[in-house]
Amino acid sequence: LDRLGGSFFIKEMTMNKKSYSILAVAIAGSMSLAACGGGSSDDKGSSSEGGGKGGTLYYLSKRPAEHLDPQRMYIGRDLADMGRLTYRSLVQMPVTEDAAKADKPVADLATDTGKMSDGGKKWSFTLKDGVKWQDGKDITCEDLKYGLSRSFATDVITGGPNYALGFLDVPQKDGLPVYNGPYKKAGQADFDKAVACDGKTITYKFNKAWPDFNLAAASLRAFDPYRKDQDKGDKSNYAVFSNGPYKLQGTWQKGKGGTFVRNENYDAKTDGVRKALPDKIVFQEGLTNEVINQRLIADSGNDKNAVTDRAVPPSMYGQVTGKIADRSTNPQSPYVDYLVPNFKKMTNPKVRQALLAATSQDAWIKAGGGDKAYTNAYSIINPALTTAYAKNPAFKYGTGGNIEEAKKLLKEAGQPNPSIKFTYSGGTPTSQKQAAALKDTWEKAGFKVTLNELTDTYYDVIQNPNADGDIFWGGWGADWPSASTVIPALFDSRINLTAKSNGQDYGNYKSDEVNKMIDEAAKATSVDAAGEIYKKIDKKLGEDVAYIPLESQKFYLLRGSNVTNYIDNPATSMYPDLGSVGVKK
């Protein structure tokens, strides 16, 4: 998941003749691990007073939902929200603040968390009895199969994750699956062999080990059921057909929002995850960050019952004191911001090493709002990914940088004053201050720096292999709690670098050694075993200065005084967990 300046942007999966390149989601005030709680910033952020059923909860946001179709959703906030309200999965991430539990899936529509066999190349799940759609009809194994089949119709069902296209044991021709989804007839028999139903049991067969498949199924909506008679192709984008505790009342209006009310055919006895406390949840889109947070600070009328995904702007930090601070939360997010040298231009390894030495995380963080906005980062892998995270020893110059060492390295490189251009996502006073802070530290080391601020669009620009820049800014968060959704997506040159795009490998980095280790990690039959390999890969990336970590983002969120049961749950990317939250009546 890409992170981009306070809002999410979908990056559709692109397929080339060789592979699938995951152009995941951009993140904002945030994909997919982290935000919210109660009390002051030194508590756990939970607010558990009250907690009974009833009342109306309001969700205030700026960014409109781009997709509510489960197979097209790929934004952390929306995946979390709809997974709690309308879309149930075979397995689901739990409602908890305990990080040790938040990354372990629990049964939802299925009777358990799945049975893995054949070294991780086969998974089976059995549906519970009594799980129904909003019209009272039973959810069937065929509904699960049909839902996944839609992901293969990449000309119709766009924007969502396409992991299934690369993992399912469906034959390929010219690098692409022979199956093209349910709207065409080609390859149906091949898909039927890879995804098979036997009564209430569904079995998935993969072409390689996928030991954390149940994590993917719990974190993404791509594997959720979808009823064939409700499918209108790309016209289903905002047509929510629920099997969860809530259903959409009327229609969803992009840019304005919609209202969810209780689903009378939902049986809470079949659901051990969601509390489903409010009677009604009203989403209001199109509000600015400043307006949202000013309303939450004022705490009047319906805003007393409101939550948000929009962080408090640094200019308002001084207003969040006393009882207002008691309604704030400041948890760690799943997102890491970083820099990538352009290997097409910055070819001298000593110059890249000098750039690393001259980079001050501390200056960047201070310019961006300080410790309420960020914490220092020591790897591109977020600490929440406990099986793969370790402080990268290659980043040895401290969070404040080492100007004298940088000068020494530039002298050794024979380039004491190299000219560099920093391309970054801008358009806000904060981003401009942060870029200026880096420029200052780099120039102290001897670099001659030009700032290249992009305001209207960003990732599609830097994904051009010939993009203008020596250094690019980037931000990323895991699709589910596994480094397999971080390292390969960003640094496997085989799935990223083509004549027309560098995918997420914005710096055009290419290493046969790294690619070989990525293959070794993919063959691992456990998440722990793969994690040890990813630690070695990360060390190699650091030694090559394939990236420079800047910080790990934090969320600074307010809520209304009537909101109850508010928790900071890594499983919902630290956005308000709608499976827990309620309102005082």
Regions found by a protein language model. Give the residues of each.
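Long beta-strand-rich cores associated with HINT superfamily self-processing modules
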Residues: 557-585
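Extracellular/periplasmic solute-recognition and catalytic clefts
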Residues: 249-261, 282-344, 367
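Surface-exposed binding/hinge segments that line
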Residues: 126, 145, 150-226
